[in-house]
Amino acid sequence: MEMMMTAAPRIAFLASTAEPAQRARQELMARYGDCSIEEADVLCALGGDGFMLRTLHRYGASGKPVYGMKLGSVGFLMNQYHDDLLERLQRAEPAKLRPLQMMAQTESGVSVESLAYNEVSLLRQTHQAAYISIDLNGQTRIDELTGDGVIVATPAGSTAYNYSAHGPILPLGSHTLALTPIAPYRPRRWRGAILKADTEIRFRVLDPYKRPVSVTADSHEIRDVVEVTIRESTEQRVTLLFDPEHNLEERIFSEQFAV
């Protein structure tokens, strides 16, 4: 389904600090003009997936759709860079994403909240394996996971770190989350689970002083956590725009057959 866009949408161009992205921004601004975030109909993010995630974290609450163009090393969430931007915006297909909402408690008693569009990952901070218990909707499912850590990934993020950790690729719009252990030692046979998107997930670090654990929501890291609660956000939603010949749903599907 294509998204209705005005014939000459007002575009705010955003770019990573990389020289190719900065140069492209200047060229596009000279051709199409530029406006503020507040006045824009659409945001155009120039860079890689890392910059796209930073753009969503910074401007996601604005409600503006975001069209990304790949000028970085990784561009799963981006479109290819082309000159015919207005035509591509007219034909673009929207993908609506809900981020994960994370609440972390640290050893010192500090509570930290963050959003994640790709994944939330708990990781051991030292050479010693982490001990983590896993509760789903208030019920303990794993008394003690021993390993490097654990990931909760959205469908959009399931092809990234989650997939590298041998987690499942989730179809876009499936309203599911991937729960994937990282290098698990015990339970030996547990390889993760696919959860409904409205599941409340709670991790407790069982030996935080001897075996400290950090948590990262996309790129926001909090160290020395003792408890982490994750649920899908019910308040925030972002819209990414993709070229119809290679939309996000097709990209996720294609990743399952990559060799």
Swiss-Prot record:
Superkingdom field: Bacteria
Record GO cellular component, one term: cytoplasm
Its EC number(s): 2.7.1.23
Positions that bind NAD(+): 49-50, 54, 118-119, 148, 156, 159-164, 183
Active-site residue numbers: 49 (proton acceptor)
Transmembrane segments: none
Record-linked Pfam families: NAD_kinase_C (PF20143)
GO process annotations (BP): NAD metabolic process; NADP biosynthetic process
Disulfide bonds: none
InterPro entries: ATP-NAD_kinase_N, ATP-NAD_kinase_PpnK-typ_C, NAD/diacylglycerol_kinase_sf, NADK
Coiled coil: none
Catalytic activity: NAD(+) + ATP = ADP + NADP(+) + H(+)
Compartment(s) where it occurs, according to its Swiss-Prot or TrEMBL record: Cytoplasm
Listed GO MF terms: ATP binding; metal ion binding; NAD binding; NAD+ kinase activity
Names of required cofactors: a divalent metal cation
Keywords linked to the UniProt accession: ATP-binding, Cytoplasm, Kinase, NAD, NADP, Nucleotide-binding, Transferase
HAMAP family xrefs: NAD_kinase (MF_00361)
PANTHER family, per the entry: NAD KINASE (PTHR20275:SF0)
Family: Belongs to the NAD kinase family.
Known role: Involved in the regulation of the intracellular balance of NAD and NADP, and is a key enzyme in the biosynthesis of NADP. Catalyzes specifically the phosphorylation on 2'-hydroxyl of the adenosine moiety of NAD to yield NADP.
NCBIfam families to which the protein is assigned, alphabetical: PRK04761.1
Protein name, UniProt field: NAD kinase
Organism: Xylella fastidiosa (strain 9a5c)
Native organism taxonomy: Bacteria, Pseudomonadati, Pseudomonadota, Gammaproteobacteria, Lysobacterales
